[in-house]
Swiss-Prot record:
Pfam families: AAA_18. Keywords: Signal. It comes from the Bacteria. The gene is yqaC. Residues 1-19 form the signal peptide. The keyword Kinase does not apply. The lineage of its organism: Bacteria, Bacillati, Bacillota, Bacilli, Bacillales. This is Uncharacterized protein YqaC.
Length: 178
């Protein structure tokens, strides 16, 4: 059984959801990079050395874990911790619709024109829309593919829009056969 699993992909693809679901089926602690990246959720970033220190501490004190979210660019030193990387991808239109829905669930009417979170949400969604076609300068598929290319662990790619349960089953099937 792989002890340390990292799940990454674009914002809105379901890395946190899959991590949480897998942790209910495996004896693994679920950790999410957002809890290390953000000092104040989605508004103020933590300094990189502090992020690394906090995350590395949790990776070492937990015997088995699932880490959801991306560490590309700030946590490259953690690659050796991973026994399996799961890469998720779904079509952009589905992903952006999920993000719009999540933004509304999180902030309500404040994300609509004239609301206090409108500009922040608009900027976030514009950034998220770059994922499939942007270069290495932002969180993008190109950056993730480049980052995964030199991993020493296996990479399981799930590149279609399927249910959380189907994703869990694919990961569990992979783990049982490898």
């Amino acid at each position: 059984m792989k002890k340390n699993i990292h799940i990454l992909g674009a914002s809105g693809v379901g890395t946190s959801t899959l991590g949480a679901a897998l942790s209910k089926r495996l004896p693994h602690t679920h950790l999410d990079t957002d809890n290390y990246y953000w000092l104040d959720k989605f508004t103020k970033k933590r300094e990189i050395p502090e992020r690394r220190k906090l995350l590395e501490k949790d990776l070492t004190i937990n015997e088995k874990w699932i880490l959801s979210g991306a560490v590309c660019g700030w946590g490259d030193n953690l690659k050796s911790y991973f026994d399996l990387v799961v890469f998720l991808w779904i079509p952009q239109d589905i992903r952006l619709e999920r993000l719009r829905h999540r933004e509304f669930q999180r902030y309500g009417n404040e994300v609509l024109a004239g609301g206090s979170k409108y500009e922040q949400s608009k900027t976030f969604l514009e950034w998220a829309s770059l994922y499939d076609n942007a270069g290495m300068e932002v969180r993008s598929r190109a950056l993730h593919e480049h980052w995964m290319a030199d991993l020493s662990c296996p990479v399981l790619k799930i590149e279609d829009d399927c249910s959380v349960n189907e994703r869990v089953d694919r990961v569990l099937d992979y783990l049982s056969s490898n």
